[in-house]
């Protein structure tokens, strides 16, 4: 049985989906009900109901590796497996090589975290810390500044539309990178994409972090800065977020978190610039709108009246 979506992503990909399902243990591919899952910006995601269970199947889109957006598939898949074993991500049921796909346990009755009330900030801090303090080691390191350079290089090569005043932005971001002075010895396993759809709330109130395409070992304050900017936290909220995470009010760590929001928005601008040149993207995802939002947040970060104080306080 097939449920078609308006953009016919399922219609185009159904043969590959069912071929992959034949390689997932305990799944009857022939009788499976397959639905398109909208909202993903990288791979083709499907919800499968079969043999009394529900799973998520991700058909891998390897084109993103070729332009420096995500790490090679084996790295991302192993990171996803680790996150599931930690208990913060969704458990992986199978890795399929032909077609390249990942089958994950469906997390039932989960909804994206609502940034309302008093408890969502400390709960998000706790979820991030669960990953960071897990003792796991992902299979790659992640530096958003270096990743942005790779993606902008790919974007230039592909004739992408770059932001206005690009060279000036490069110089301003370079000052932030110099101040933050990333050091590999400080790195912990990081999600690196902590925005609404990737932070799910279970019926019991637990938070789960899904989608490890951008994951890697990195500076924990990058995850905090990413969440702070994507959840549009004001300064008071960022202070509460950092205090919940670090169990203290520390102006140095708050400043680092705020400056890592610059890194986040710069890297995502680069990502969306590349994405807008790609042929096999998902029709229901607004890549241009995401680029506009990343640029808006980046300009807000760099025009903050206390940017100089942030740079001073964040220095090692």
Provide a role label for each language-model segment.
Residues 35-57, 177-222, 236:
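Active-site acidic catalytic loop and adjacent metal/ATP-binding pocket
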Residues 1-32:
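Juxta-kinase regulatory segment immediately upstream of eukaryotic protein kinase catalytic domains
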Residues 221-252, 263-282, 293-297:
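Active-site activation/catalytic loop segments of kinase-like enzymes and analogous catalytic loops
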Residues 23-31, 85-88, 180-184:
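Short secondary-structure junctions
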Residues 87, 128-136, 180, 203, ...:
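A general structural signal marking secondary-structure boundaries and capping sites
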Residues 35-143, 160:
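ATP-binding pocket architecture of kinase catalytic cores
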Residues 110-171, 178-188, 214-218, 285-289, ...:
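A cross-family kinase active-site recognition segment
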Residues 5, 158, 164, 272-316:
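ATP/Mg2+ or Mg2+-diphosphate-binding catalytic cores
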């Amino acid at each position: 049985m097939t449920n078609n979506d308006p953009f016919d992503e399922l219609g185009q990909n159904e043969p590959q989906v069912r071929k992959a399902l034949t390689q997932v243990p305990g799944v009857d591919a022939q009788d499976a009900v397959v639905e398109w899952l909208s909202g993903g910006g990288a791979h083709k995601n499907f919800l499968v109901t079969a043999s009394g269970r529900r799973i998520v199947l991700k058909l891998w889109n390897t084109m993103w590796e070729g332009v420096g957006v995500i790490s090679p598939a084996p790295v991302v898949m192993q990171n996803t497996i680790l996150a599931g074993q930690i208990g913060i991500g969704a458990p992986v049921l199978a890795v399929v090589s032909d077609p390249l796909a990942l089958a994950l346990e469906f997390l039932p009755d989960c909804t994206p975290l609502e940034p309302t009330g008093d408890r969502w900030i400390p709960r998000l801090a706790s979820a991030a810390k669960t990953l960071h303090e897990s003792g796991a080691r992902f299979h790659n390191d992640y530096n958003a500044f270096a990743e942005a350079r790779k993606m902008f290089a790919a974007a230039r090569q592909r004739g992408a539309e770059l932001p206005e005043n690009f060279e000036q932005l490069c110089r301003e971001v370079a000052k932030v990178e110099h101040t933050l002075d990333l050091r590999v010895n400080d790195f912990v396993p990081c999600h690196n994409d902590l925005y609404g759809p990737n932070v799910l709330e279970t019926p019991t109130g637990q938070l789960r972090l899904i989608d490890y395409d951008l994951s890697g070992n990195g500076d924990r304050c990058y995850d905090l800065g990413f969440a702070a900017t994507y959840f549009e936290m004001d300064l008071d909220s960022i202070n509460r977020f950092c205090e919940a995470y670090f169990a203290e009010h520390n102006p140095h760590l708050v400043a680092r978190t705020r400056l890592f929001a610059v890194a986040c928005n710069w890297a995502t601008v680069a990502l969306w610039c590349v994405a807008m040149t790609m042929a096999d993207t998902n029709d229901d995802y607004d890549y241009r709108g995401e680029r506009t939002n990343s640029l808006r947040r980046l300009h807000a970060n760099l025009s903050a009246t206390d940017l100089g104080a942030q740079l001073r306080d964040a220095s090692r």
